[in-house]
Design a protein with these regions (language model features):
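Structural signature of transmembrane alpha-helices in multi-pass secondary transporters
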Residues: 32, 61-64, 68, 95, ...
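12-transmembrane solute porter fold
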Residues: 18-41, 54, 237-249, 261-433, ...
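Transmembrane-helix bundle of Major Facilitator Superfamily
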Residues: 2-194, 328, 336, 347-350, ...
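Interfacial helix-cap and linker-helix signal at transmembrane-aqueous boundaries
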Residues: 46-47, 78-79, 164-172, 226, ...
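Cytoplasmic-side transmembrane-helix entry/capping segments in multi-pass membrane proteins
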Residues: 90, 142-154, 204-214, 239, ...
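Intrinsic disorder in cytosolic terminal tails and internal cytosolic loops
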Residues: 1-17, 201, 464-476
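A residue-level signal for alpha-helical anchor/packing sites in multi-pass solute transporters
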Residues: 132, 136, 167, 195, ...
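Hydrophobic transmembrane-helix bundles of small-molecule transporters
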Residues: 148, 170-283, 288, 306-307, ...
Length: 476
């Protein structure tokens, strides 16, 4: 076991401006979220250059997502124990080096390995971005605005993936969807090394390696099973076995956590209403929102015959809407409370998804992409900030990194599960046909299903989310 130091805060020089700390944290979050989606428009070029088959193309996306989700809790706990700045630098360094390796890959396995290491680096980096930000900004309106900015930048990174990828592939090559991270990562690394102050929980507890291995293996195996559903179906052995194995590993994780003296995830956290309810709501919201970008891009290219760059440009208003929603949320939270803003955001998004489900083969841009896209993403931005605020408000300071990691894990795993289920629904409705009419029917059913998920999530928020952010509660 590795021992954590009990020093709570390293000596530092004059504190940097708060805006600079927020900017560095948000830059790290932007890179993490951007790489979830930026490779999508580059997949055909990757296939032609490296000889990837259909399964290989799937793993270009899944290798990152699985490693990201599977190692997230370990990254959050490591930040609490060994220092948020240190883990920020380690995670961003891994991410940047893996981006370089992926951009220079000459064989398919090299690209897939690089994507997995990117996901590992992102999992170490992402939890530290939020805890560094909340440590630098005093609690209250200023922190709510900072979290709103963090949420907006993260959402904007996901939204910008298609546009950035389209520009880079059209102007340069597929390799630059990865290589672009290298200069940006180097600049952020230098700024973080110079300006960020070190902080940690300082409780002297040891890193729970057995728990970390079990939860990472469980989430990774479960995510692998989910990724198999589109190709093999839900009842195939290739799907059922990893799903069962993943659930068994997660069960073993819970058993270990209930017995160890210094657990990776104190099970008492699950009894904190704010933490549990906000994370379940985040999982449901993520399962719908993640699918929006994927299926809107497919609809634009496969049905309306947009180029990758045109598809990215078509979604720019939606990208701006999610940023607007994230910036409006803190102001509305002061007037209405976090719970009602989260509910309102989910309902606005549900209206957009319902509208999008009326899409047609010859749909006009204004009514089939732009306006419903704006509503969907405005609602997403409004909901995400209060949910993140509620989740972190229920934790003790020494658990902040863990809860931050749990928020990101909930969103990512919800998105992975949602995408697998929605892809299966779309494929079943279109019966494997590539005709525009059949594809449109499949995509429409996906948006109707997502509408229902968001409405269920809104009801859950009304019944379960606390009216006000919780005071820090004991989690053990």
């Amino acid at each position: 076991m590795l021992e954590a130091t009990d020093v709570t805060r390293a000596p530092r020089r004059t504190a940097p401006p708060t805006w600079l700390v927020v900017a560095l944290a948000c830059a790290g979050q932007f890179l993490v979220v951007l790489d979830v989606s930026v490779v999508n428009v580059a997949l055909p070029s990757m296939r032609a250059d490296l000889g990837l088959d259909a399964q290989g193309l799937q793993w270009v996306v899944n290798a990152y997502a699985i490693a990201f989700a599977g190692f997230m809790l370990l990254g959050g706990r490591a930040g609490d124990l060994y220092g948020r700045k240190r883990m920020f630098l380690v995670g961003l360094g891994l991410f940047t080096l893996a981006s370089l390796a992926g951009g220079l890959a000459q064989q398919d396995w090299q690209l897939l390995a690089a994507r997995a290491v990117q996901g590992l680096g992102a999992a170490v980096l992402a939890p530290s971005t939020l805890t560094i930000l909340t440590a630098a900004v005093p609690e209250g309106a200023a922190r709510a605005r900072a979290i709103g900015t963090w949420t907006a930048v993260g959402a904007g990174g996901g939204a910008a993936g298609g546009l950035v990828g389209g520009v880079l592939v059209d102007v340069l090559s597929w390799r630059w969807v990865l290589l672009i991270n290298v200069p940006v990562g180097a600049v952020v690394l230098a700024g973080a090394a110079l300006w960020l102050a070190e902080s940690r929980a300082g409780d002297g507890r040891r890193l729970d390696l057995p728990g970390a291995v079990l939860v990472t293996a469980g989430l990774g195996t479960l995510a692998y099973g989910i990724s198999q559903t589109e190709a093999a179906g839900w009842t195939a052995t290739a799907t059922v076995l990893p799903l069962l194995a993943g659930l068994a590993l997660l069960g073993a994780f819970l058993a270990v956590e209930s017995r160890t003296a210094a657990p990776l995830m104190p099970l008492g956290l699950l009894r904190v209403r704010a933490v549990a309810s906000a994370n379940v709501a985040m999982l449901l919201s993520g399962s719908a929102m993640f699918c929006m970008w994927f299926f809107m891009t497919l609809y634009a290219q496969n049905v309306l015959h947009y180029t990758p760059l045109e598809a990215g440009l078509a979604l720019v208003p939606s990208s701006l809407a999610v940023i607007l929603g994230s910036k409006l949320a803190p102001r509305l939270m002061r007037r209405m409370g976090a719970r009602y803003v989260a509910v309102m955001g989910s309902l606005v998004a549900a209206v957009g998804f319902g509208w999008q489900s009326t899409l047609s083969v010859d749909g006009a841009y204004l009514t089939s992409i732009m306006v419903p896209g704006i509503l969907m993403m405005l609602g997403a931005g409004l909901a995400a900030t209060p949910l993140a605020s509620l989740a972190t408000s229920g934790a003790r300071p020494e658990e902040a990194g863990l809860v931050s990691g749990l928020v990101n894990t909930s969103r990512t795993m919800g998105g992975s599960l949602g995408l697998a289920i929605m892809s299966t629904i779309a494929a079943a409705r279109s019966a494997g046909s590539g005709a525009p009419g059949a594809l449109t029917e499949g995509y429409a059913l996906v948006f109707r299903t997502s509408t229902a998920v968001l409405l269920v999530g809104a009801v859950l928020m009304v019944l379960w989310l606390p009216r006000k952010p919780a005071a820090s509660s004991p989690a053990a």
